[in-house]
Amino acid sequence: MSTSFENKATNRGVITFTISQDKIKPALDQAFNKIKKDLNAPGFRKGHMPRPVFNQRFGEEVLYEEALNIVLPAAYEGAVAELELDVVAQPKIDVVSMEKGQEWTLTAEVVTKPEVKLGDYKDLTVEVEASKEVTDEEVDAKVERERNNLAELVVKEEAAVEGDTVVIDFVGSVDGVEFDGGKGDNFSLELGSGQFIPGFEEQLVGAKAGDTVEVNVTFPENYQAEDLAGKAAKFVTTVHEVKAKEVPELDDELAKDIDEEVETLDELKAKYRKELEASKEAAYDDALEGAAIELAVENAEIVELPEEMVHDEVHRSVNEFMASMQRQGISPDMYFQLTGTSQEDLHKQHEAEADKRVKTNLVIEAIAKAEGFEASDDEIEKEINDLAAEYSMPVEQVRSLLSADMLKHDIVMKKAVEVITSSAKAK
């Protein structure tokens, strides 16, 4: 196979490559065996037409397209490897010549990975907004959250105040006409929770059990039900019960109810302080790492980032997002209806982050190359075992899912990130 590359513009060019007859002939045989199963011809059983008869009747050229589909992937990848090109995005393939008995000649318009001119990426000094310090107020707030989780709702006779829960029936109408979804029975609503549209909950403050309250509200302009958006509505609301939140005493017994491993409130607070310190330390390290990587990317120059790279990353990101929505039972149509957005809007929302990720990956890859990082067999094996432990999967299953090249790439990328972050300091 002969190959050549002609540079057309920055990060763009055309590969010309040939496919030899020793590759074409087996591909033609495979193509014939694939289509002959459906062939009918006088004097032959279905699927048993001899090759010479086929060639005479239809011509060998009929097989060329199928044969090309068979032989092209390996031929193209071989040409890219021989030319040592770092290609991104899908190529545009054109046939130059496909003559019988001759080698085939093709071209591939390709986009290549851009050059990265690295700036400073070691000993960086960065702004880090996160703090490692844990205050008494943060510890007390965590205890208070757990205390509130153990609160009980107790029926009271007094008027409802914000934070109380009311059990209500309601019937909604617009211009005197009831609408779908505007009716509820024995609904528990915490006042101040923001569960209902703005203005609804506030009008139930002061109500008592047995009261009927006429709640007047206006649906937001961006309300998901377009036929109700911006319209004034009336909800006739009957209050059946008012319940107050009763929290337990803040003492050692509460501490033991929250965590059976402690005996006193002081022990619980000490445990929470240690947990918060570990959490804030991790958050600080993440913030330092993120800021250092961001500065290393800013310090580098990427020579004409191909739009195809960002476009592909946007598609990958959107597909991943929609897959996560579908796992939650939300179809694409349902998502766009609920959010009032379109496929185009979603792509635009992902563009900035996609652009940032592509640039970041390019710079980290360039650092790994500049540092001469490689991945040893032992490091690959450790990575497989670590992933198996992290995701509770058999080692062999992880090995079958991830190629050696993917694992090597991940390992050298981690090494490059470590080079950036290990010497970075906060201002």
Swiss-Prot record:
It comes from Streptococcus equi subsp. zooepidemicus (strain MGCS10565). SUPFAM superfamilies: FKBP-like, Triger factor/SurA peptide-binding domain-like, Trigger factor ribosome-binding domain. Consists of 3 domains; the N-terminus binds the ribosome, the middle domain has PPIase activity, while the C-terminus has intrinsic chaperone activity on its own. GO terms for molecular function: peptidyl-prolyl cis-trans isomerase activity; protein folding chaperone; ribosome binding. It is an enzyme of class 5 (isomerase). The keyword Disulfide bond does not apply. Residues 163-248 form the PPIase FKBP-type domain. This is Trigger factor. Its EC number is 5.2.1.8. PANTHER family: TRIGGER FACTOR CHAPERONE AND PEPTIDYL-PROLYL CIS/TRANS ISOMERASE, TRIGGER FACTOR-LIKE PROTEIN TIG, CHLOROPLASTIC. It is found in: Cytoplasm. InterPro entries: PPIase_dom_sf (IPR046357), PPIase_FKBP_dom (IPR001179), Trig_fac (IPR005215), Trigger_fac_C (IPR008880), Trigger_fac_C_sf (IPR037041), Trigger_fac_ribosome-bd_bac (IPR008881), Trigger_fac_ribosome-bd_sf (IPR036611), Trigger_fact/SurA_dom_sf (IPR027304). The keyword Transport does not apply. One of its GO terms (biological process) is chaperone-mediated protein folding. Keywords: Cell cycle, Cell division, Chaperone, Cytoplasm, Isomerase, Rotamase. Involved in protein export. Acts as a chaperone by maintaining the newly synthesized protein in an open conformation. Functions as a peptidyl-prolyl cis-trans isomerase.
